[in-house]
């Protein structure tokens, strides 16, 4: 059931999740259970619903209730009639009600970055992540991100992964979380269309910016990660796991013996895992050494590297098209991500 609640200011405690909590606080909101994330704009919210994500509440301009939010709210009414007690609403006592907070734009405009939300925000429960084995069971092309710390890059990589046919994305625990606000926004909601999980631990501690900092920051970007993570990815363990699942692993790195990305050997691999490294330093030497092959993108004008998000798009297109050549233009984008 939907409950429309008119608000005249942002002082209510239940609204702090939209403008006053950083990503770490949202992530740990129901600790030790999974927390929440914020989806922005009708398109992104629809993609999250398509993936089975469950709303906790909405915040939107009053005029949108009968316009661009109408179909979304109708979906949520139907959602309530199903057995949601098996999903994330077990966190709430009032589990049969989804509050929809509405206000005039003059009130909502006080939220930094509100103009980017297209007039609608939704707090949703973080779903439990699947195991690597579950995600890779029928996959032929997967992307592996090692310590990619910038949520903008993570979001852009997911958008390319969705568009260019990756079957799953696996992240080391040093990566920025795909459900951070900026990552979701940059991905245009495709983080809900590509199955993903962590290699190893599913959760990890976050480093939060000093709350007294005078630096202006956008909601959802209050996380400051070390650009050189203290914890190194245990590449030996996940490499072994991927090999047991039948994957040939390729490290995207520039070495004297690197294969060109269009090498026929790579195109003919049945199951391929494409490993991309952190901004700046790229992949750890031990990760490169543990991969079956090292692959590079031929470049001109003496350029020796691309931004990790740009490199991922090239790699996904070249190395993914053979596996998906029969259906690359007809991929189903509405499958369920989490059970």
Predicted feature locations:
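Glycine- and other small-residue-rich loops at beta-strand/loop junctions that grip anionic moieties
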Residues: 7, 37, 146-147, 172-173, ...
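Short, aromatic/basic amphipathic alpha-helical patches
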Residues: 68-93, 287
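Active-site/ligand-binding-proximal alpha/beta "capping" segment
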Residues: 250-301
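A glycine-rich helix N-cap at a beta->alpha junction
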Residues: 78-83, 93-109
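RNA substrate-binding interface of SAM-dependent RNA methyltransferases
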Residues: 2, 43, 50, 81-87, ...
């Amino acid at each position: 059931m939907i409950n429309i609640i008119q608000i005249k200011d942002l002082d209510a405690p239940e609204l702090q999740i939209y403008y006053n909590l950083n990503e770490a606080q949202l992530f740990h909101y129901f600790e030790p259970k999974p927390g929440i994330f914020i989806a922005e704009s009708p398109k992104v919210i629809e993609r999250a619903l398509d993936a089975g994500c469950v709303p906790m509440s909405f915040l939107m301009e009053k005029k949108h209730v009968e316009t661009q939010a109408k179909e979304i709210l109708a979906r949520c009414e139907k959602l309530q009639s199903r057995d949601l007690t098996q999903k994330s609403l077990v966190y709430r006592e009032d589990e049969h009600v989804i509050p929809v907070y509405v206000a005039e734009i003059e009130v909502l405009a006080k939220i930094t970055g509100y103009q980017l939300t297209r007039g609608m925000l939704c707090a949703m429960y973080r779903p439990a992540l699947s195991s690597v084995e579950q995600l890779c069971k029928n996959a032929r092309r997967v992307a592996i991100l090692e310590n990619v710390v910038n949520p903008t890059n993570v979001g852009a990589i997911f958008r390319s992964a969705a568009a260019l046919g990756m079957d799953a994305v696996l992240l080391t625990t040093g990566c920025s979380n795909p459900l951070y606000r900026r990552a979701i926004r940059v991905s245009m909601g495709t983080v809900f269309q590509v199955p993903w999980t962590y290699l190893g631990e599913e959760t990890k501690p976050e480093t939060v910016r000093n709350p007294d900092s005078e630096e202006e920051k956008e909601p959802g970007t209050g996380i400051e990660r070390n650009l050189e993570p203290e914890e190194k990815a245990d590449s030996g363990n996940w490499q072994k796991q991927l090999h047991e699942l039948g994957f040939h692993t390729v490290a995207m790195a520039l070495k004297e013996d690197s294969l060109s990305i269009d090498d026929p050997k790579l195109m003919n691999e049945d199951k391929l895992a494409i490993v991309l490294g952190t901004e700046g330093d790229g992949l750890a030497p031990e990760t490169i050494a543990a991969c079956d092959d090292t692959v590079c993108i031929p470049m001109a004008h003496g350029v020796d590297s691309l931004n990790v998000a740009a490199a991922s798009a090239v790699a996904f297109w070249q190395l993914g098209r053979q596996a998906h050549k029969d259906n690359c233009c007809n991929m189903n984008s509405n499958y369920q991500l989490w059970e």
